[in-house]
Structure formats: structure tokens, C-alpha cells
UniProtKB/Swiss-Prot annotation:
It comes from the Eukaryota. The keyword Cytoplasm does not apply. It is found in: Plastid, Chloroplast thylakoid lumen. It comes from Arabidopsis thaliana (Mouse-ear cress). The lineage of its organism: Eukaryota, Viridiplantae, Streptophyta, Embryophyta, Tracheophyta. This is Thylakoid lumenal 29 kDa protein, chloroplastic.
Amino acid sequence: MGGVSFLSTVPSFTNTTNHQHLTTLSSSSHRSAVIRCSKIEPQVSGESLAFHRRDVLKLAGTAVGMELIGNGFINNVGDAKAADLNQRRQRSEFQSKIKILLSTTIKAKPELVPSLLKLALNDAMTYDKATKSGGANGSIRFSSELSRAENEGLSDGLSLIEEVKKEIDSISKGGPISYADIIQLAGQSAVKFTYLASAIRKCGGNEEKGNLLYTAYGSAGQWGLFDRNFGRSDATEADPEGRVPQWGKATVQEMKDKFIAVGLGPRQLAVMSAFLGPDQAATEQLLATDPQVAPWVQKYQRSRETVSQTDYEVDLITAFTKLSCLGQQINFEAYTYPVERINLSKLKL
């Protein structure tokens, strides 16, 4: 039987039987990509090797089945991987919506950037390595913790986060976002805002050119691990007192001691200077009095004077990513939801 063609890619079945052959058409100018099943002369006397309709249907059915497997619709070997891909897509889409809303909200209230940075820092800095308690768990939302001296002036930043959370929760298909997650994501958006603001300043205040500069030379591609660590759980009560310094009153040694206690150090203290208070220049002036911190302060100041400020941005992202996960076991299935499955038994070929 001749003249049966498959325009889609079909796997080779030449080994399934010793009397079926696939031949490709050729011409004087080119070789066709169309695969054709052709009748050939029998090599064993008395044996008919013609393709029957059932053979063609078998090939077509196999091709459709393999395509369904490739697309994750078969409930067998690839099912777990398909589910994992669906969950990644759902989480990524949800996170993108949060980031867009945070970016828009922060752009309208840039004066809250220092508050958002310190909220992210202080929520995480309650981590105690010895007891493995505290950390980036959203406990700063409790009034008994927010009212502490080290958190003075952060209530407006938390109010902004509450507003965004309320809107995000109203559209979430996978449950409400945790305070732990949205506090750190707000910190991330605040950091990005400072990066973009710096690029705009370097372009003489031209927002369009600043956006182009940040897009071309910025560090957006360095946030991968931070974004993946999405699924923090919330504390059910305030963290213990006395774990976070009053950054505006602490000595450099006290600041170093706290950073070291959570697994960071002088380098991270220097690069995260913007998190310690609203006046980064004044903070860095103080930090530069310490011989261990001073070289790093100078390094990042030089970096911020460059067009791309790569060293500063990349090192800050690295330090912030580590800080944002203190005390957490990330739930990589958070914010996912079941999707409707295709019932293959109802499909007719």
C-alpha cells in the first residue's frame, strides 16, 4: 500500500518486524523530509509484505501517544516531572505578579525604601544559630516585636506590605502569601529600586536612559537563587527580644558581632550598609573606622561610581539572598494548586 505520509516526526519502528521498511523520497535537487510507507517486493516467497490499514493506525497511535508523553499528559513515568514543571510555572507566575505590584507601589512611595530594607534585615536578624530559632519568618509583623526600639519607624513600611499582601491574597490560587516571603520580596524590590535610581542619576535624571542603562548593565540575572527560595513559613509568635541591635546606636564591633553570629561577616556588613539606616553615607563613614570593614566599604564605594556598579550589586544580592533564608526550610511547593487532568480514556483515535 503506497501513498501514506506522516508530516510530523514519527519514531523509527524498523526493528519491530523484519518485513517493514521506511524509505525516503529523493529528487535530483533535494531529499524530502516526508516519511512514506511503501509496499516492497517480498524477499521470502509466498509472503505478502504489504502495509495494512491497521499498521498505519498503529504507527499513528504510537506517534500520538509519544507526543502526549512528551507534553506530560500521561500518568506514568513522566507524571512527577510534569507536575514539577506545572508547580514551577505556577510559582513563577505568582511571584511575578507580586513583584510587579511591589515595584509599582514602591515607585509611588520611594520614601519607604529605607524602612522596607530594614524590615527585611531585622526580621531575619532574629536568627539564633545555637538554637536554630528565629530568622526570616515574618515575626516582625507582631506588634510586640514591631514596637521594640530596634524597629522604630518601620510601621509605615509594614503598612505598605499589608496593603500589597491583601491585594495579592485576593488573586492567589494557591493560598495567601506568607509574611515571611512578602517582607523579603519587598526588600528585594527596594534594592532593585535603589539600583535603578542610581542608573537614572548617572544618566542625568533621564528615566528612559536610566532604564536602558540598568537593563543593559544591571544585575537582574543574579537574583535566581533568591527567587527560587520562595516558600518561607510564618512564625506564630514574636521572636525573643535582645537579638537585633539598634543599628543607629550600635558600635561597629557590635554590628560585626551580630553579622558573624548569623554566618555573615565584615564584607557583608559593608555591602549591606543601606539596610542599616536611611543615611547610607553616614553609616559607611562609621563602618570605615573599623580596619576589617573599611577595605570593603571603599571597594563598594568605588564600585558604585562605575557605570555598572557590578561588584556592589552582585555582592549585595549574594549577601541578601543568604540573609533572607536564615532559619527557614523552603517549601518549594508553596502557592501551587491542582490542575485539571486530561482523561485519556475519553480520547478517541
